[in-house]
Curated annotation (Swiss-Prot):
One of the primary rRNA binding proteins, it binds directly to 16S rRNA where it nucleates assembly of the head domain of the 30S subunit. Is located at the subunit interface close to the decoding center, probably blocks exit of the E-site tRNA. Part of the 30S ribosomal subunit. Contacts proteins S9 and S11. GO terms for molecular function: rRNA binding; structural constituent of ribosome; tRNA binding. PANTHER family: RIBOSOMAL PROTEIN S7 (PTHR11205). This is Small ribosomal subunit protein uS7. Belongs to the universal ribosomal protein uS7 family. It comes from Nocardioides sp. (strain ATCC BAA-499 / JS614). HAMAP family: Ribosomal_uS7_B. GO terms for biological process: translation.
Length: 156
Protein backbone atom coordinates (compact mmCIF):
# COMPACT_ATOMS: atom_id res chain seq x y z
CA UNK A 1 0.00 0.00 0.00
CA UNK A 2 1.36 3.44 -0.86
CA UNK A 3 1.81 5.74 2.10
CA UNK A 4 0.63 8.83 0.30
CA UNK A 5 -2.87 7.52 -0.34
CA UNK A 6 -4.56 6.78 -3.63
CA UNK A 7 -3.26 8.37 -6.82
CA UNK A 8 -5.22 11.48 -7.82
CA UNK A 9 -7.71 11.13 -10.66
CA UNK A 10 -6.47 12.62 -13.90
CA UNK A 11 -8.88 14.86 -15.80
CA UNK A 12 -10.36 13.28 -18.92
CA UNK A 13 -9.71 15.21 -22.12
CA UNK A 14 -12.67 16.47 -24.09
CA UNK A 15 -12.95 15.11 -27.63
CA UNK A 16 -12.09 17.77 -30.25
CA UNK A 17 -14.79 16.73 -32.76
CA UNK A 18 -17.82 16.00 -30.55
CA UNK A 19 -16.83 17.96 -27.43
CA UNK A 20 -17.65 14.96 -25.23
CA UNK A 21 -15.65 13.14 -22.58
CA UNK A 22 -17.49 9.91 -23.39
CA UNK A 23 -16.24 9.93 -26.98
CA UNK A 24 -12.72 10.60 -25.71
CA UNK A 25 -12.98 7.61 -23.35
CA UNK A 26 -14.35 5.45 -26.18
CA UNK A 27 -11.37 6.38 -28.36
CA UNK A 28 -9.06 5.35 -25.50
CA UNK A 29 -10.80 1.97 -25.22
CA UNK A 30 -10.54 1.31 -28.97
CA UNK A 31 -6.87 2.37 -28.98
CA UNK A 32 -4.33 -0.38 -29.69
CA UNK A 33 -0.52 -0.13 -29.86
CA UNK A 34 -0.64 3.64 -29.31
CA UNK A 35 -2.28 4.30 -32.69
CA UNK A 36 -4.63 7.04 -31.62
CA UNK A 37 -5.43 8.39 -35.09
CA UNK A 38 -6.56 4.93 -36.20
CA UNK A 39 -8.73 4.65 -33.07
CA UNK A 40 -10.21 8.11 -33.68
CA UNK A 41 -11.00 7.26 -37.30
CA UNK A 42 -12.76 4.04 -36.20
CA UNK A 43 -14.83 5.83 -33.54
CA UNK A 44 -15.72 8.86 -35.68
CA UNK A 45 -16.73 6.67 -38.63
CA UNK A 46 -18.85 4.50 -36.32
CA UNK A 47 -20.55 7.57 -34.81
CA UNK A 48 -21.20 9.05 -38.26
CA UNK A 49 -22.78 5.72 -39.23
CA UNK A 50 -24.99 5.97 -36.14
CA UNK A 51 -26.02 9.48 -37.22
CA UNK A 52 -26.92 8.22 -40.73
CA UNK A 53 -28.90 5.21 -39.48
CA UNK A 54 -30.81 6.92 -36.66
CA UNK A 55 -30.91 10.54 -37.80
CA UNK A 56 -30.12 11.72 -34.26
CA UNK A 57 -27.04 13.08 -32.52
CA UNK A 58 -24.56 10.17 -32.18
CA UNK A 59 -23.45 11.31 -28.70
CA UNK A 60 -27.06 10.96 -27.49
CA UNK A 61 -27.20 7.48 -29.05
CA UNK A 62 -23.90 6.58 -27.34
CA UNK A 63 -25.18 7.83 -23.96
CA UNK A 64 -28.39 5.81 -24.36
CA UNK A 65 -26.31 2.73 -25.26
CA UNK A 66 -24.08 3.21 -22.21
CA UNK A 67 -27.10 3.63 -19.93
CA UNK A 68 -28.41 0.29 -21.21
CA UNK A 69 -25.03 -1.44 -20.70
CA UNK A 70 -23.90 0.19 -17.43
CA UNK A 71 -24.25 -2.27 -14.52
CA UNK A 72 -25.79 -1.15 -11.22
CA UNK A 73 -24.31 -4.05 -9.24
CA UNK A 74 -21.43 -6.49 -9.73
CA UNK A 75 -19.79 -9.34 -7.82
CA UNK A 76 -16.31 -9.41 -6.31
CA UNK A 77 -14.51 -12.45 -4.96
CA UNK A 78 -13.98 -12.46 -1.21
CA UNK A 79 -12.07 -15.21 0.56
CA UNK A 80 -13.50 -16.16 3.95
CA UNK A 81 -11.91 -19.08 5.75
CA UNK A 82 -11.21 -21.64 3.05
CA UNK A 83 -14.04 -20.64 0.76
CA UNK A 84 -14.26 -17.95 -1.89
CA UNK A 85 -17.60 -16.14 -2.12
CA UNK A 86 -18.89 -13.96 -4.91
CA UNK A 87 -20.02 -10.91 -2.93
CA UNK A 88 -22.41 -8.49 -4.66
CA UNK A 89 -21.45 -4.82 -4.42
CA UNK A 90 -22.95 -1.77 -6.08
CA UNK A 91 -21.01 -0.14 -8.88
CA UNK A 92 -19.97 3.42 -8.10
CA UNK A 93 -19.75 6.40 -10.47
CA UNK A 94 -17.08 6.18 -13.11
CA UNK A 95 -16.55 2.43 -12.76
CA UNK A 96 -19.96 1.79 -14.31
CA UNK A 97 -19.09 3.91 -17.34
CA UNK A 98 -15.67 2.27 -17.64
CA UNK A 99 -17.17 -1.22 -17.51
CA UNK A 100 -19.85 -0.28 -20.04
CA UNK A 101 -17.27 1.09 -22.49
CA UNK A 102 -15.02 -1.95 -21.99
CA UNK A 103 -17.89 -4.36 -22.65
CA UNK A 104 -19.15 -2.35 -25.63
CA UNK A 105 -15.74 -2.34 -27.36
CA UNK A 106 -14.94 -5.93 -26.34
CA UNK A 107 -18.15 -7.36 -27.74
CA UNK A 108 -17.87 -5.15 -30.83
CA UNK A 109 -14.51 -6.81 -31.56
CA UNK A 110 -16.16 -10.24 -31.38
CA UNK A 111 -18.85 -9.40 -33.95
CA UNK A 112 -18.90 -10.79 -37.50
CA UNK A 113 -18.91 -7.58 -39.56
CA UNK A 114 -15.94 -6.89 -41.80
CA UNK A 115 -14.54 -3.63 -40.39
CA UNK A 116 -14.16 -2.46 -36.81
CA UNK A 117 -16.15 0.74 -37.34
CA UNK A 118 -19.11 -1.32 -38.64
CA UNK A 119 -18.89 -3.63 -35.63
CA UNK A 120 -18.69 -0.73 -33.19
CA UNK A 121 -21.55 1.12 -34.89
CA UNK A 122 -23.81 -1.94 -34.83
CA UNK A 123 -22.95 -2.76 -31.20
CA UNK A 124 -23.74 0.85 -30.17
CA UNK A 125 -27.03 0.78 -32.10
CA UNK A 126 -27.96 -2.63 -30.63
CA UNK A 127 -27.10 -1.46 -27.11
CA UNK A 128 -29.12 1.74 -27.53
CA UNK A 129 -32.10 -0.45 -28.46
CA UNK A 130 -31.54 -2.79 -25.50
CA UNK A 131 -30.10 -5.62 -27.61
CA UNK A 132 -26.62 -7.01 -28.25
CA UNK A 133 -23.95 -8.92 -26.37
CA UNK A 134 -22.94 -6.01 -24.11
CA UNK A 135 -26.50 -5.68 -22.77
CA UNK A 136 -26.60 -9.46 -22.25
CA UNK A 137 -23.35 -9.18 -20.23
CA UNK A 138 -25.01 -6.59 -17.98
CA UNK A 139 -28.03 -8.86 -17.48
CA UNK A 140 -25.73 -11.79 -16.66
CA UNK A 141 -23.83 -9.65 -14.15
CA UNK A 142 -27.09 -8.63 -12.46
CA UNK A 143 -28.27 -12.26 -12.38
CA UNK A 144 -24.96 -13.33 -10.81
CA UNK A 145 -25.32 -10.63 -8.14
CA UNK A 146 -28.93 -11.63 -7.51
CA UNK A 147 -28.07 -15.30 -7.08
CA UNK A 148 -25.26 -14.43 -4.62
CA UNK A 149 -27.36 -12.00 -2.58
CA UNK A 150 -26.98 -14.31 0.44
CA UNK A 151 -23.31 -13.30 0.70
CA UNK A 152 -24.00 -9.56 0.73
CA UNK A 153 -23.14 -9.36 4.44
CA UNK A 154 -19.49 -10.14 3.56
CA UNK A 155 -19.29 -6.72 1.91
CA UNK A 156 -16.27 -4.60 2.84
Amino acid sequence: MPRKGPAPKRPIDIDPVYGSQLVSQLVSKVLQDGKKQVAQRIVYTALEGCREKTGTDPVVTLKRALDNVKPAIEVKSRRVGGATYQVPIEVKGTRGTTLALRWLVGYAQDRREKTMHERLMNEILDASNGLGAAVKKREDTHKMAESNKAFAHYRW
